[in-house]
Regions:
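Active-site-proximal, structured, solvent-exposed surfaces of multi-pass membrane proteins
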Residues: 49, 702-854, 935
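Extracytoplasmic/secreted cell-surface and envelope-processing proteins
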Residues: 255-256, 294, 535-538, 618-623, ...
Length: 936
């Protein structure tokens, strides 16, 4: 120590060292949580704000905010927050589902269960997605039900532009690609070349709002996956968001699995293999409670036999893949190809992934034209929306790469960060203006434009001083976009329809019949005539809500979830026979229209208590029947009671067990069910899939004389008719009586006068049904259950199966895995890019993009790295650059005269840095978030 220095030290240092002070008490959990919540926003605000950063965020605010505002305009917020019941297309029938979940399932601690509301009963939310319904129920806690429903229905289409932007940021694409990806999302939403495939505004308003929600989750989750494959972070968040996407729609599940797998392969190395595997296991486990029961029980669903595309001489795969006008197809696809090629050349893995996934989706559309293997149930055009969206997003990569190529070609030096930011902002604004003008013309809302006539054709033109600068034709079937009008139509609600009074009167009439004390009336199932005039109530599916309005007293035979019940085909066969002109949505069935002599016996077999007819032809048919009784009228409707239509009846002849046949078991059951249902006189006994040993076993064979067509989905083909191959021995049963019949939401009770006699229960068969006081239940034609009482009191109940419970256990395991991943820490990749040749040392920060903090990321020379701009190869991961902004110089990075000039220094992100490791703040040390990560 220099002389005299001790005189400057505090006196305490001359004394003997004292005992170490006790450690400061740890912060409380609320304090740590509070610091965690505010830390990132605080760091974001306190980071330096150079010109380039300001331009970037202002551009993002303008474009992402503008896209979101545009979507809010389209959905008509004033109507969204009107307290009414949404209608229109399938959406008008979707109203029932979340309300049933709230009132009948969640009150019992369930999110899946049974409902008797539609199709003689169906498993509720086993084959349809429960997450969007749960969101509606949660929001209904603070908002009226109709408003909560509409808010959630709009959630996917409103958030998609933001999620596309977030994907671009998370995948580290160059500015302004993420901002332009928000516009790509908007273009996809306004694409009206398809209306029922899913994802865009028309599909969402048609009822596919679960699809649009799932799509937003999917894009966000894939962005998180891209960031995680780069940095090893966000493993749990990625698993959660991708699981939500898979749980929100089954078709999106296919896309998520395919896209995530391809991204994993593109990024693959040793540590990224571990990251993808562990994240994927967690995501699958989290979704197991819904996905696995769906997969294990798909044989009990109805295949609607939608066919495939291309369909007909005027359809082709070319038409499917290039759905826009020729000009826009060339523009969109051309720039998308440029984006893909440039990404491959620059080894931008996420850009290359988008292109590869587009080609994979095209292949999937072709390969699934005969539906999915084993499961079936897929209409191959449902995969097209993912291709369309990724193509729009990849187009934006191509546009920006083209601009960068042009700039590099005309300049002799590297552009500064400010110049790059300005160029990026100008590019983004110009693209935004082109899209805005295009959409304003598309919606016929261009300021200053007017309708006119040119060369004898109606036009819509915009110009200045009498000169028409832009003119579009206003002739043909489609004059303007209808996304905005469709949302307005839906959200005006049932209550806003001109014929709402007639509709409400009909519902009230049915409710009064259900409340009638007459034992011949009361609650029961109702079949209503299919006719287009029902659309006057808001949707042709309006009467599907009969159980919703009557608290389940009057069940509707027809419901929205067509595929969720194996009884669906038999309803539509019955409805056709009782309707003047039926919809016949299940293909290949042998329908008979408007013949009550055929229809009434079918209603009796189905246990239908009421039939509601609208047309004069159907009324005349009903009036001619002695087994129908007119019990009420309401407006143009007549309501008849069906005689001998009890739900639980004793059998008079012992059933026979039909031996199994090879092939698609869903098709084999449909053949057997329709053969008995439509040709009962050819069967001496009720056919069953299984039964006691004393029941006769028989074989059946296809009646070749009545076969129409052979190949599945062949035009004109009909389901085969099967007949017994041997004589059925008629074993008559003793007559018994049924009493004390009671049907609950998920139970059915009745008493019998004698045990041992089989009893038919006209409720959809499903293996989760169990019975106390009887053997069975056994599946019988058409899709019902038979029990053999062993007690005079029989109790049937729906409960989770063993496989269901194992699926729930897997989801619990998924939660435990996320706890384990959180405890073990992030996966530590050797490099930030799998093609890098220089490993990243422990002292080299691996996060070098603006998505962390602006000032904390440096290259080897101390220059701040901004991942938002372009950099030359060798490895261009999303087009990186290290700009120098003359407004922002780090104190730790001395600048000489040459570098002080407004020149850029391009950094190689794969050169090990010489900076110190990021220093931890006391808050970060307190939270324990920066422990050395394990390899897993």
């Amino acid at each position: 120590m220099p002389p005299g220095m001790s005189d400057l030290l505090p006196a305490e240092l001359h004394s003997a060292p004292s005992a170490e002070p006790s450690p400061a008490p740890a912060s409380s959990l609320p304090a740590r949580v509070g610091r965690r919540i505010v830390r990132r926003p605080r760091n974001w605000l306190e980071s330096p704000w150079p010109t380039a950063r300001i331009i970037q965020y202002l551009t993002a605010l303008l474009l992402v905010g503008g896209c979101t505002v545009a979507m809010l305009q389209i959905i008509h917020l004033d109507l969204v927050f009107s307290n009414n019941t949404p209608t229109g297309g399938d959406m008008g029938a979707h109203v029932m589902g979340p309300a049933y979940l709230r009132d009948n399932l969640m009150s019992q601690g369930q999110i899946t269960g049974w409902s008797n509301y539609w199709y003689n009963g169906l498993p509720m939310y086993r084959f349809y997605m429960v997450v969007p319904a749960l969101m509606i129920v949660a929001l209904n806690v603070i908002l009226p039900y109709g408003i909560a429903f509409k808010v959630v229905a709009c959630l996917g289409i409103v958030t998609l532009p933001f999620c596309c932007w977030a994907f671009g940021r998370l995948a580290r694409f160059a500015f302004p690609i993420p901002e332009l990806m928000a516009i790509a999302g908007l273009l996809f939403l306004f694409d009206e070349s398809f209306t029922i495939y899913g994802g865009n505004v028309p599909s969402t308003m048609a009822g596919e709002f679960s699809f649009s929600i799932a799509l937003s989750f999917a894009i966000l989750g894939l962005g998180l996956l891209a960031r995680g494959l780069e940095t090893g972070k966000f493993r749990n968040w990625t698993a959660i968001v991708l699981a939500l996407a898979m749980l929100s729609h089954g078709i999106v599940l296919i896309f998520v699995v395919l896209a995530a797998f391809i991204m994993w392969l593109v990024w693959m190395d040793r540590t990224r293999f571990i990251y993808g595997l562990t994240m994927g296991i967690a995501a699958v486990a989290l979704s197991a409670f819904w996905v696995f029961p769906f997969l294990f029980n798909h044989a009990y669903m109805t295949d609607m036999k939608y066919g495939f595309r291309p369909d007909g001489p005027n359809d082709s795969f070319w038409v499917m893949f290039f759905d826009l006008s020729p000009f826009w197809d060339i523009v969109v696809t051309g720039f998308a190809l440029i984006g893909f090629i440039s990404s491959v050349v620059k080894r931008n893995l996420n850009g290359a992934w988008m292109g590869i996934t587009c080609f994979a989706l095209m292949a999937a559309v072709y390969l699934t034209r005969d539906s999915l293997p084993v499961i079936g149930l897929l209409w191959n055009p449902r995969l097209l929306p993912f291709f369309y969206l990724l193509r729009f997003m990849l187009m934006m990569v191509g546009i920006v790469d083209t601009v960068h190529f042009v700039i590099k070609g005309i300049r002799t030096r590297l552009p500064t960060s400010r110049e790059l930011a300005v160029v990026g902002a100008i590019t983004a604004v110009l693209v935004g203006l082109v899209v805005t003008v295009t959409q304003l013309f598309f919606f016929r809302t261009m300021p200053g434009a007017e309708y006119g006539t040119k060369n004898g054709k109606a036009t819509y033109s915009w110009g200045i001083g009498g000169w028409d600068l832009i003119t579009v034709s206003n002739t043909g079937d489609k004059l303007r976009a209808y996304s905005d009008s469709w949302t307005a139509y839906n959200f005006k609600g049932y209550e806003g329809r001109e014929y709402y009074g007639e509709y409400k009167a009909l519902v009230d009439t049915m409710a009064s019949l259900g409340a009638d004390a007459d034992p011949d009336l009361g609650c029961g199932r109702a079949l209503w005539e299919v006719n287009s005039s029902n659309g006057l109530y808001g949707t042709t599916m309006a009467l599907m809500l009969l159980p919703h309005w009557t608290d389940g007293c009057i069940a509707s035979q027809e419901g929205l979830f067509f595929e969720a019940s194996g009884t669906t085909p038999y309803h539509f066969i019955s409805a056709a026979a009782m309707s003047q002109k039926s919809s016949n949505p299940v293909r290949e069935l042998r329908y008979t229209d408007n013949d009550a002599a055929v229809g009434v016996p079918m209603l009796q077999k189905m246990g239908v208590k009421y039939v509601m007819v609208f047309t004069e032809a159907a009324k005349n048919q009903a009036d001619s029947r002695d087994d129908l009784e007119l019990v009420a009228s309401s407006g143009p409707w007549k309501i008849y009671r069906v005689f001998d239509s009890e739900v639980v009846v004793p059998l008079t002849v012992q059933p026979v067990v039909v031996a199994g046949r090879s092939g698609d078991q869903r098709e084999r059951n449909l053949e057997l069910g329709t053969s008995w249902f439509q040709n009962t006189d050819e069967w001496a006994a009720l056919p069953a899939d299984d039964g006691p040993e004393e029941w006769q076993r028989i074989d059946v064979a296809v009646d070749m004389d009545r076969r129409i067509g052979t190949a599945p989905l062949e035009p004109g083909r009909k389901v085969d008719i099967v007949v017994p191959s041997e004589t059925i021995e008629v074993n008559e049963l003793e007559p018994i009586t049924i009493s004390n019949y009671r049907m609950g939401d998920q139970t059915l009770d009745f008493d019998v006068s004698q045990i041992g006699v089989p009893v038919l229960v006209k409720m959809s068969y499903f293996p989760n049904w169990k019975v106390d006081g009887a053997d069975g239940p056994y599946r019988v034609a058409p899709n019902f259950m038979v029990v053999v009482p062993t007690s005079t009191s029989v109790h049937m109940h729906y409960e989770p199966s063993t496989s269901d419970r194992l699926s729930y256990l897997l989801t619990f395991v998924g939660i435990l895995l996320m706890v384990l991943w959180r405890y073990r820490g992030d996966v530590r990749h050797l490099n930030v890019h799998p093609f890098a040749t220089v490993p990243t040392s422990d002292d080299t920060p691996t996060e070098w993009a603006t998505t962390a903090t602006w000032a904390e990321e440096y290259d080897a020379s101390g220059v701040p790295i901004d991942a938002s701009f372009d950099v030359s190869p060798p490895f261009d991961h999303g087009a990186f650059v290290a700009p120098v902004d003359d407004d922002f110089v780090l104190p730790s990075a001395p600048v000489d005269d040459a570098s002080a000039d407004d020149a850029s220094v391009v950094a190689d992100p794969f050169t090990p840095g010489v900076d110190e490791p990021p220093r931890l703040t006391p808050d970060e040390l307190d939270e324990g978030e920066h422990r050395p990560p394990d390899s897993v």
